[in-house]
Design a protein with these regions (language model features):
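N-terminal nucleotide-binding beta1-loop-alpha1 segment
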Residues: 1-21, 241-259
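Conserved N-terminal catalytic core of the sugar/cofactor nucleotidyltransferase
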Residues: 2-7, 33-106, 279-305
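A structural helix-start
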Residues: 9, 13-16, 27, 33, ...
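Conserved beta-loop-beta/alpha segment of the NTase-like Rossmann-fold superfamily
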Residues: 64, 72-149, 326-363
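Conserved core of the sugar-phosphate nucleotidyltransferase
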Residues: 114-193, 355, 360, 375-385, ...
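Catalytic-core segments of class I nucleotidyltransferases/pyrophosphorylases
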Residues: 122-123, 153-226, 231-235, 239-240, ...
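Acceptor/aglycone-binding surface of glycosyltransferases and processive sugar-polymer synthases
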Residues: 145-155, 308-322, 339-420, 451-462
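Hydrophobic helical membrane-anchoring modules
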Residues: 214, 219-277, 283-289, 296, ...
Length: 487
């Protein structure tokens, strides 16, 4: 059976603001891929759909620019413009349905499915039903209250209840529908009097058909599911996608070597032995004998800038660009960080786009470290200033300059071209740009130790009033550049 794929994606996404200030809600990235693209690929891969109709409205040009004619994604995309997004989902379905004369699978564009069984939809669904509604087991009752439930009798749907106050059972309805052409003809009849004459709520309209005796059937979906309506829903979607395939992800540890030789080589070897690290990329200005000894070309790779004057930002970007992992961890070669914290970063990266360490938790700082007194207060001041300047993003930081951090490759790709700092300011700059990209950052306490004698030059080189002033200027300039962009 040749199926049409229908993806209504015209809504404004008000509840997801400011994420939807410049893109449609359906184009929000989930693990680096727009959710709408994920649904196009689901239709293509699980149901063999090659003819996809996308209803566009709010920021519709973003969708058209991304998909084009669909050939890049192995489908043919036809766009249906909805000039009246205020008329809600039924009007979008009506506009697209006027040109649909074949069975159609409709997925709501803001729903994310992970590990689903949509491939079984055609074989398992009632072939006589005009509408098949996908159901899935909810993890929490509040999920059901945000969606709908179906009332069954003899295996058929006889009613649909939108956002039930007291749901019974664990099943809830989803935005997966198998629709026969007759449904679109019925919708055309209801809109015969003009755009204002039709239904305003899709679930209520389906419920009226079910109560009138139109044959409808359920289909039991498996896997995990979230309807992306808010920032929290987007975070949940990212977690579900990343957690589903986390064990298959490769992790690269980028270790920035700042002039040391024997000491750095010892630390590189320790990180290479840490569970969860697939490769260590040691990046330095020039080739050093000790690093050459530990670099085996597979587990440990040595990358050099071939420039004795290369600054820290150059080394950082060079190492990250050369790393091959899906997950990128980053540290600096002054032997103050603990390899055992790698596991901590990997746990939190399931929930975040970037995880930044903080050296301000007193219980985890070795006595005698430089993170005390005026140095500690300076780091906290910069972090709190960032919170104030970007307060609407509800960020919480105490140490935005900490080098020890982890992030997804997709996050780095997003911010790469915006990193313009030339020296150690790149570390707070990365935090700023991830925030500006509206990605999620979590700060975690890490172990922090005293520097060995061979690394003491780091203190005099970077922990200066001049460095503080440069970071301060960076924060102010980036915030001023954001004025009017998302308020």
């Amino acid at each position: 059976m040749a199926l049409i794929g229908l993806l209504p994606a015209a809504g404004r996404g008000v509840r997801a603001y400011p994420h939807t200030a410049t893109v449609p809600k359906s184009m929000l990235d989930v693990d680096g891929v727009p959710n709408l693209q994920r649904n196009v690929e689901l239709l293509r891969d699980q149901l063999g759909v090659r003819d996809v109709r996308i209803v566009v409205g709010h920021h519709g040009e973003v969708i058209k620019r991304h998909f084009g004619d669909g050939s890049r994604f192995g489908v043919a995309v036809t766009y249906v413009d909805n000039p009246r997004v205020d008329l809600e989902l039924p009007y979008s379905v009506y506009l697209a349905g006027r040109a649909i004369a074949e069975p159609c699978v409709m997925l709501l564009a803001d729903e994310c499915y992970v590990g689903s069984n949509h491939a079984e939809l055609l074989s398992a669904a009632d072939p006589a039903a005009l509408v098949v509604c996908g159901q899935i087991a909810a993890e929490y009752a509040k999920q059901i209250r945000k969606n709908y439930v179906v009332e069954l009798r003899d295996g058929r749907i006889v009613d649909l209840i939108e956002k039930p106050s007291h749901p019974i059972g664990r099943l809830m309805g989803t935005g997966t529908y198998l629709l026969q052409p007759e449904i679109f003809r019925r919708l055309e009849t209801d809109y015969a009097g003009g755009p204002e004459s039709g239904p305003r709520d899709w679930t209520s309209w389906l419920a009226s058909l079910a109560r009138a005796g139109v044959r409808m059937a359920p289909f039991m979906l498996r896997g995990r599911y979230v309807n992306i309506n808010s920032r929290d829903d987007l975070n949940t979607a990212n977690y579900l996608v990343r957690d589903h395939a986390f064990e298959s992800k490769r992790t690269s540890f980028v270790y920035v070597v700042d002039g040391e030789d024997e000491g750095a080589a010892r630390v590189v070897a320790r990180y290479a032995e840490e569970a969860g690290v697939d490769e260590v990329v040691a990046v330095s200005r020039t080739v050093t004998p000790a690093l050459q000894r530990v670099a085996d070309g597979t587990r440990v790779r040595l990358v050099t800038a071939d420039d004795p004057a290369a600054r820290i930002a150059t080394l950082v970007k060079l190492g990250l660009d050369r790393a091959t992992g899906d997950i990128l961890l980053l540290a600096y070669s002054d032997d103050t960080f603990a390899p055992r914290d790698v596991g901590k970063f990997l746990v939190y990266l399931r929930d975040a786009d970037m995880v930044v360490g903080t050296r301000t938790t007193r219980q985890m700082i070795e006595q005698g470290t430089n993170m005390r007194g005026i140095v500690r207060h300076a780091h906290v001041v910069l972090a709190k200033l960032l919170q104030i300047l970007w307060w609407r993003f509800e960020c919480r930081f105490t140490d935005i300059c900490c080098v020890y951090r982890g992030f997804w490759r997709s996050t780095y790709v997003t911010i790469r071209d915006h990193l313009t700092a030339e020296d150690v300011e790149i570390f707070p700059e990365m935090v700023i740009e991830v925030l500006r990209a509206r990605r999620r950052i979590i700060e975690i306490p890490i172990n922090y130790y005293s520097r060995d004698l061979e690394y003491l030059q780091v203190h005099s080189r970077y922990q200066t009033v001049a460095t503080f002033a440069r970071v301060l200027g960076l924060l102010v300039r980036r915030r001023l550049a954001d004025r009017g962009a998302w308020e």
